[in-house]
Curated annotation (Swiss-Prot):
Gene: Asxl2
The protein, known as: Putative Polycomb group protein ASXL2
Zinc finger intervals, PHD-type: 1332-1369
Primary localization: nucleus
Spans annotated as Disordered: 92-216, 340-487, 516-535, 643-734, 805-891, 1103-1175
Residue ranges constituting the HTH HARE-type domain according to the UniProt record: 11-86
């Protein structure tokens, strides 16, 4: 019983059905009846969940289709089967044809499949099946599915829609061809050359084939080009041309020959012995695929005389190994089905097959062996003859050859060709198709044995097509030939249609040769696959595979890549997104790639939805529009500016997003930023996007939010909205949320200022209404609420720069009042800030053009941050955004970038290290600004609460840190650095003054921050530590380092930090921020602190943000923190007066604390190093940072991550207080040098406790910061630089611990000193390791930088064909 059960279980449907039919031998049964018997008698265990009837039906279809099939479909009835052995041979053939015809429509699919699977036991069956397969493929022109599956398809005289369709298709094809011809004129075979075919082929095509599209009249003759890729048939839907109606128009003998190319299933033998088309023969998937395959091969140029000659040569070469091949021939045709070579040969050789199909196949096979050598016999027929003649001619040639061999067999293919050309191209195509397909198959297989067998098969098929081909093939192997004939024809129906006509045009010999070669080639494949599947499908698959590798893969790929890549670089294109991941994951070695990456990258992270893509595209458009405004500037920004911003932002964005996502809430924040970073990066061409995005990248608390934003913005606001949208979510989620909006705004800032205005308007508009300061303030405040989402983000963006100006500056720009605070565009913002002082004045130009770039891409990132910072308190929030934006903004609208791109007076120093210096410069402007009342911004308003002076000081600090931060962010690749440089140089003194001036206020803010920080400490690292750190750092620096320190403390450090993270690192984040995402998250607090350091306002904001985010946002990215600070700070700013006051007081105490715990602060912020450095080696650090920054900024853009990391390491080391090793690689290591002083840096957590309520938490959070911090402290001239460094370090750390850290530090240090440190502060090895690993230009092709030869993605390198580093240098 058990055995029986097992048997029952293991029994196949075929076995069960066979058992049933054996039990009722002479009773043909339908599949339903068979199933009933199976179920009744329990012949097969039917598992639940299967549809027995469908399974059984499919099996019957499959196994009734080939000669090896065990079942026979009864001719005149629907789905009625009997066992083959029960059917007499004579009837068998008829019944097979008719049953196939009746089953035709549904049959063709399954039967083909199963025939390949059933591996017929008898070789003859296999041969016949191959034959049928080939023929079915060949003559399966898509005829509209005929309602009548009746065996005979009467030639309907009524014009059916299909006929109309075919006429239409022909006319259309003719039109297309004529157009094509006009373009290519005398080079119809050009397309061939583009394929894998050689020029030789092209030449042959053009020479031998006139390739005239030919009017319809001529088309009816043999004038259609069926050889060259130029053929009208390439543009024709063969299934529309070849249908039962057009087929019925052909001469009878032609029809019969063509029918032989179809699988037996698809033709029926009538009582008169004449074959007729099955109802579905030309309307099934097999014929469709055959037509498609033939068309593909035609377009590849496989049928050109040149290719045919080549194929023939290959076949001849293969002949040398023919014996060996023959030995293994069975492997392809006989082995799998259990047939021996002898059997297959016998089957092939026996031309007495009862079935017409078999006979033709066999005859050609037998003949082929005898006439194998004369493959080119067909050439005898002149091609010049009319198509009708041509049809006949091939016939004669075939007939002659056939006569030599088995005339019917070899004749059938050739006559088919002839008749096809004569009566209809369509038919001709079919026959040729099969040979060609086979040829194609043959080409594929290279193995000698395979090739030889293929040869035979091909020859057989060819013999049908051409006698000489048949002869050759026959010599090789009859059975193979037959298989090739059947199989290949199946595939070739359409493929050969085109060639047929050319063949007609060409001498028959050519046709024959073509067919032979193509058939042979296909044969080889066919042989291999014959065993696996006798059906048309395998062949098709083979054909397709071969064809595609040959034609589609080689050129189309390159062409597409070349075209798309170039045009995609400037705009954000979907392909970039796809490409970016892989491409950029190469560890982001080339920053140049980064920028372009950022272009595409922004959306790479997170969802790559249609909405994303659309938003991206819109963003790009918006950016382009924005860029259009500053054509040169935009272009420059796009190339150069973007490089810095987008490079890191874009590249990192995805990672950052990913990391952030992982991180959690904070992570989420980052993600949006990431996306935004990409967006901004995308804005490469645009300006704001990139800057804004980058900065924001970190802030985006929620990737999802970011995604929605992306999806949301239909147009320019795509990025913006994305950020804005993100902001709400992020804000709601956590203080960091504000950060998210920032990115959106930033992102939008340049290209999407209008949108930004809208988005920002929501939050910022209230501010707008108010006085700029008030606006800023309110923005900061309103951001707290819904405005925070859009307003906060807006504000931040305003502060940040281009985008921020949208909310603040931009918005203001649109609205003069806002402009005053944050000079509308990023440049204005920067200008505003810088305007106040001479350095600012200088900055305005650089800032607007260079400063902005260096700081935050014009005002957007660094400048705005700096300006914002300067303007700050209110800007502080903005600064946060802006800082983050510094980086991103710089690329797009950044004047500095523009200047750089334009080759203007933006020195490299400005671009790289100067941003830090610039920060200091900015500080002075801040003071001036304050005096002017412009630098106030919402940030100032916020600070107003504390005191204008403090605000000023803070602004100065903010500005410097922001600059530093933008610098940092730009360090990756930000032109803004030069701006900083300019400013820094000018500002060193001013910075100091500002520091002092803002000391009290800054101190107050710092006290506030300290208080808040303490509260935050308690609330954990989330954001409090960063905030506290910033406050502490700010205060600390103020007290300890007096002006410089104060500057650093006065949010400058924080801002700077943030920029490094947000701007520079944001870029990194998006590119390689992900890897550091965790770190970043870890240093969420640090980033916040850093942000705080960025500027007093920012510090407050930071504190506030930290405070708010402490609980939930600590892990948000530094950028997020920054953004949060911007948003949260804004929120605090909304509430901000109090927070500011409290922060001020807290900060003050903290300031003192910072003073006392300079190292702690540094360490806490990752600034420890900076403060310590400042104390111990302030000058040195400054110096180091200066050159580090210069180097850093230069390199970062260039190498972005890798370079940044290295430079970071070097810078850190150079600074000695680069950062604590604790956090990240080199930066941290560098810190150790200053370790004694930087112990806190080294032990950021410990120092964090000192600096923050919960230093431990902060410490980890600030590891990255620590790295930067040291640098920052080192900068004695400006505490801000140190602070910035710290903040940046945090930023860097957070994102890319080392990279960000160093940049911040560097930014800070250069602030006071010339950026001497050649090594970038950003050695972030971690960052490099983290982020460089993935480039988010997954789908981009790699191109070489014309400047340095580095490879990166098309998107990354951009239209200038220069990598980020080269762009920055230029």
């Amino acid at each position: 019983m058990r055995e029986k059960g097992r048997r029952k279980k293991g029994r196949t449907w075929a076995e069960a059905a066979k058992t049933v039919l054996e039990k009722y031998p002479n009773t043909p049964m339908s599949h339903k009846e068979i199933l009933q018997v199976i179920q009744r008698e329990g012949l097969k265990e039917i598992r639940s969940g299967t549809s027995p009837l469908a399974c059984l039906n499919a099996m019957l279809h499959t196994n009734s289709r080939g000669e090896e099939g065990i079942f026979y479909k009864v001719p005149g009835r629907m789905g009625v089967y009997t066992l083959k052995k029960d059917v007499p041979d004579g009837v068998k053939e008829l019944s097979e044809c008719s049953e196939e015809s009746s089953d035709g429509q549904s049959d063709s699919h399954s039967s083909d499949n199963s025939s390949s699977s059933d591996g017929g036991s008898n070789k003859e069956g296999r041969k016949s099946r191959w034959k049928r397969k080939v023929s079915s493929r060949l003559s399966h022109p898509p005829s509209p599915p005929s309602g009548c599956p009746s065996p005979t398809i009467p030639a309907s005289k009524v014009i059916s829609p299909s006929q109309k369709h075919s006429k239409k298709a022909l006319k259309q094809a003719l039109k297309q061809q004529q157009q094509k011809k006009k373009q290519q004129q005398c080079r119809p075979s050009m397309s061939i050359s583009n394929q894998h075919l050689s020029l030789k082929t092209v030449k042959a095509a053009s020479d031998s084939v006139p390739a005239k599209p030919g009017q319809m009249k001529r088309t009816k003759c043999a004038d259609i080009d069926v050889e060259t890729p130029d053929s009208i048939l390439v543009n024709t839907n063969l299934r529309a041309l070849i249908n039962k109606h057009t087929f019925s128009v052909l001469p009878g003998d032609c029809q019969q020959r063509l029918l032989l190319l179809l699988p037996e299933v698809d033709r029926q033998v009538g009582p008169d012995g004449l074959m007729k088309l099955n109802g579905s023969a030309l309307n099934n998937e097999f014929f469709t695929s055959a037509a498609q395959g033939w068309k593909e091969r035609l377009s590849e140029g496989e049928f050109t005389p040149e290719m045919q000659v080549r194929i023939r040569q290959e076949i001849e070469k293969e002949k040398k190994v023919e014996l060996w091949k023959e030995q293994f021939f069975e492997n392809y045709y006989g082995q799998s089905s259990g047939l021996s070579l002898e059997d297959s040969q016998k089957l092939t050789a026996s031309s007495s097959d009862p079935k017409a199909k078999k006979t033709p196949a066999e005859q050609p096979k037998s003949i082929l062996p005898s006439e194998a050598s004369p493959v080119r016999i067909v050439p005898v027929v002149p091609q010049s003859e009319c198509k009708e003649e041509a049809v006949q001619i091939p016939s004669p040639s075939q007939k002659e050859e056939n006569q030599d061999e088995a005339r019917p067999d070899s004749k059938s293919p050739e006559p088919v060709l002839a008749s096809a050309s004569n009566t209809n191209e369509l038919i001709t195509m079919k026959p040729i198709k099969s040979p060609k397909d086979e040829g194609l198959l043959e080409q594929k297989p290279v193995a000698c044995a395979e090739q030889e067998s293929e040869k035979e098969n091909h020859v057989t098929t060819t013999s049908r097509n051409n006698k000489s081909e048949n002869q050759e093939a026959l010599a090789i192997s009859p059975s193979k030939s037959k298989n090739a004939g059947l199989q290949k024809p199946i595939i070739k129906p359409v493929a050969e249609a085109s060639p047929l006509n050319p063949d007609m045009k060409m001498p028959p010999a050519t046709v024959t040769d073509q067919i032979q070669e193509s058939l042979k080639r296909k044969s080889s494949l066919t042989d291999e696959e014959a065993t696996s599947s006798w059906e048309k499908r395998p062949r098709i698959t083979e054909n397709r595979q071969h064809q595609q590798p040959f034609q589609v893969s080689p050129q189309p790929f390159l062409n597409r890549g070349d075209r798309v890549q170039v045009r995609k670089v400037p705009p954000l294109k979907i392909p970039v997104s796809r490409i970016s991941p892989m491409l950029f994951s190469t560890s982001q070695v080339s920053p140049r790639a980064r920028f372009p990456i950022s272009i595409t990258s922004p959306y790479r992270t997170g969802a790559r939805t249609l909405a994303d893509i659309k938003a991206k595209a819109q963003l790009v458009e918006a950016q382009k529009a924005a860029a259009a405004a500053a054509a040169a500037a935009a272009a420059a920004a796009s190339v150069g500016g973007t490089i810095p911003g987008p490079g890191p932002g874009g590249g990192q964005s995805p990672r950052e997003g990913g990391e952030r996502k992982i991180a959690g809430g904070g992570s989420a924040g980052s993600d949006p930023v990431s996306t935004n970073g990409k967006g901004p990066t995308l804005e490469l061409a645009g300006t704001g996007s990139r800057g804004g995005t980058r900065e924001l990248l970190p802030c985006g608390p929620q990737p999802e939010t970011n995604m929605p934003g992306q999806a949301q913005p239909p147009g320019i606001s795509g990025a913006q909205l994305q950020q804005t949208s993100s902001v709400p979510t992020g804000l709601a989620s956590s203080g960091a949320c504000t950060s998210v909006p920032l990115p959106a705004h930033i992102e939008i800032s340049n290209s999407e200022k209008p949108n930004l205005h809208k988005a920002t308007a929501t939050a910022a508009s209230p501010c707008h209404l108010q006085d700029p300061r008030s606006c800023r303030l309110e923005k900061a405040l309103s951001p707290t609420g819904p405005p925070l989402i859009s307003g906060a983000s807006t504000v931040y963006f305003v502060a940040d720069g281009t985008v921020e100006p949208k909310a603040g500056s931009n918005k203001n720009a649109p609205k003069p009042s806002a402009l005053a605070k944050t000079t509308a565009p990023a440049p204005l913002d920067m200008t505003s800030s810088p305007v106040t002082t001479a350095s600012l004045e200088k900055l305005p130009v650089p800032q607007i053009s260079g400063t902005a770039t260096s700081t935050g891409s014009a005002p957007s990132s660094s400048t705005l941050p700096a300006a914002s910072s300067l303007k700050t308190p209110g800007t502080s929030a903005n600064m946060n955004g802006p800082i983050s934006r510094t980086s991103s903004s710089i690329p797009a609208n950044n004047p500095l970038v523009t200047q750089l791109l334009q080759g203007k007076d933006v020195p490299l120093e400005q671009i790289l290290p100067k941003p830090l210096t610039k920060i200091e410069m900015k500080t002075v402007p801040l003071t001036t600004k304050e005096e002017k009342g412009i630098g106030i911004f919402p940030g100032i308003s916020v600070m107003e609460s504390s005191s204008r002076e403090e605000v000023n000081g803070r602004q100065a600090h903010l500005a410097i840190p922001q600059l530093g931060k933008p610098l940092q962010s730009k360090q990756l690749s930000q032109v803004p650095r030069p701006v900083f440089t300019a400013k820094d140089r000018k500002d060193p003194c001013i910075d100091t003054h500002q520091y002092r001036e803002g000391l009290s206020k800054t101190t107050q803010d710092q006290l506030f921050q300290t208080l808040i920080q303490r509260a935050q400490r308690q609330s954990v690292l989330s954001f409090v530590p960063p905030s506290q750190f910033n406050f502490a750092h700010s205060g600390f620096h103020l007290e300890d380092i007096s002006t410089s320190q104060k500057f650093m403390l006065g949010f400058a450090g924080r801002r700077t930090s943030k920029p490094a993270m947000a701007g520079h690192y944001l870029l990194n984040i998006s590119t390689y921020g992900r890897g550091t995402e965790n770190i970043k998250r870890t240093h969420s607090v640090n980033p916040d602190d850093r942000f705080c350091l960025s500027s007093p306002t920012e510090a407050l904001r930071m504190g506030h943000a930290d405070y708010k985010n402490t609980t939930g946002e600590i892990s948000s990215k530094e950028d997020e923190s920054d953004e949060d600070r911007v948003g949260d700070e804004q929120e605090p700013i909304s509430v901000k007066e109090e927070p500011w006051a409290s922060q001020s007081s807290g900060r003050h105490p903290h300031h003192g604390e910072a003073s006392s715990t300079n190292d702690c602060l540094a360490s806490k912020n990752g600034k420890t190093e900076a403060p310590v450095s400042e104390q111990t080696t302030l000058g040195q650090e400054n110096y180091i940072f200066s050159r580090g920054q210069a180097s850093d900024e230069k390199s970062l853009p260039r190498d972005f991550i890798p370079a940044a990391h290295k430079q970071m390491t070097h810078a850190v080391r150079g600074k000695t207080v680069c950062s604590s090793p604790e956090l990240f690689n080199s930066t941290a290591l560098s810190l150790p040098a200053d370790s004694p002083t930087h112990q806190p840096l080294l032990l950021p957590p410990l120092q964090t406790p000192k600096l923050y309520g919960s230093p431990t938490q902060i410490g980890p959070s600030y590891r990255g910061m620590i790295n930067v911090s040291t640098s920052s402290d080192m900068d004695h001239n400006s505490a801000i630089p140190g602070s910035q460094v710290s903040s940046n370090v945090g930023d860097v750390m957070s994102f890319s611990v080392t990279v960000t850290t160093i940049p911040a530090s560097q930014a800070m240090n250069p602030s006071s000193h010339g950026q001497t440190i050649p090594v970038q502060t950003f050695p972030d090895d971690n960052s490099i390791e983290d982020t460089p690993s993935k480039c988010y230009c997954r789908l981009k092709a790699m191109i070489m930088c014309k400047g340095c030869g580095a490879f990166c993605h098309d998107d990354c390198i951009g239209p200038s064909k220069l990598c980020v580093s080269c762009l920055v240098v230029r």
